[in-house]
Regions:
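GST-like domain detector, emphasizing the conserved glutathione-binding G-site
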Residues: 1-71, 78, 83, 87
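Residue-level signal for nonpolar/aromatic packing positions in well-ordered secondary structure
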Residues: 8, 77, 95, 125-128
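Active-site-flanking alpha-helical
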Residues: 13, 101-102, 135
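Generic structural signal for individual residues within well-ordered alpha-helical segments
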Residues: 28-31, 97, 119, 132
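GST superfamily/GST-like fold recognition
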Residues: 40, 45-49, 86-113, 119, ...
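Long hydrophobic alpha-helical segments typical of transmembrane helices together
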Residues: 118-139
Length: 139
């Protein structure tokens, strides 16, 4: 049994031979951006979702702190995607891990127009029929 989404994505990529390069430098570039999602995007965007949408009490400090960090992470993604189609070479599990969080940019009250490279990347991924079908599955 494999648990944790990042480990599951790595397992599936290894098993299928898809979406993870075999060349070491390219492989670790994908892993680096997968870990960026696991350690940064997921936790921070999740806190934005909680404090903006689910918390019974509005806590301005928490909302501001996580929203500010969320926008900073969008900036990191935007810089990374400048002149690149995907986060790490070809489309990879790093993109698949980050996409669901960006898909909920409306929950974060983030306008993708503020991050044109992220917006382009998002549109490119959402043009893939398999990803669109996956994002249509209720969580």
């Amino acid at each position: 049994t494999v648990i944790e989404s990042g480990a599951i994505l790595m397992y599936l990529a290894e098993k299928s031979g898809q979406f993870m390069p075999t060349e070491m430098a390219a492989r670790y570039e994908v892993i680096q951006w997968l870990m960026f999602q696991m350690g940064g995007i997921g936790p921070i965007f999740g806190q934005v979702h909680h404090f903006k949408r689910a918390a019974k009490e509005q806590v301005p400090y928490a909302i501001n702190r996580y929203y500010t960090e969320c926008r900073r992470l969008y900036g990191v993604l935007n810089t990374r995607l400048e002149g690149r189609e995907y986060l790490a070479g070809d489309v990879s599990i790093a993109d698949f891990a980050a996409l669901p969080w960006v898909f909920r940019h409306d929950w974060q009250e983030v306008d993708l127009g503020d991050f044109p490279n992220v917006n382009r990347w998002y549109d490119t991924l959402m043009a893939r029929p398999a990803l669109t079908r996956g994002m249509d599955i209720p969580a």
